[in-house]
Amino acid sequence: MAIYVLKPFDRNFKGDMIADIKLCLAARELIAGQYEASLGGGVYKKRIPLGAGKSGGARAIIAFKSQKHLFFVNGYAKSTTKSGIREIKEDELNLYRQVASQLFAMTTEQERAAIKARKMREVICDG
């Protein structure tokens, strides 16, 4: 199983790039069933600490299906969302589910082409 980060995820954290080791930890936790919300269609919401604890950290939208790869699709800093308002709108959620379905259907050749085109990058985790 490979772990990939899509370009929108990295772009949203351009100034506060999240270290790959934190992405690996978040991926391991999600695979172990530790996540904030299952949003359906293989889409999950996961908190990632940015140094000041998880409550003030980042939120990742992750596509994962058992026996498939894991994709960090999008993300945002918790501080950018207003409290009391739904963080992910229904139309965004439907789009994430569609994207997840397309990602799960990718062939190895399509994955390589996406990496070469810099649409996503692979994260290498130790152990």
Predicted regions and their residues:
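Charged, alpha-helix-enriched surfaces in structured cytosolic catalytic cores
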Residues: Y4, G56, D91, L95
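N-terminal first-folded block
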Residues: I3, K7-P49
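Arg/Lys-rich, positively charged N-terminal/basic patches that mediate binding to nucleic acids
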Residues: M1-I18, R112-G127
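Enriched for short, Lys/Arg-rich terminal
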Residues: F64-G127
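Generic alpha-helix signal with a bias toward terminal, lower-confidence helices
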Residues: G15-D16, I21, L25, L30, ...
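Basic/aromatic recognition patch in beta-strand/loop cores that engages polyanionic ligands
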Residues: Q34-T81
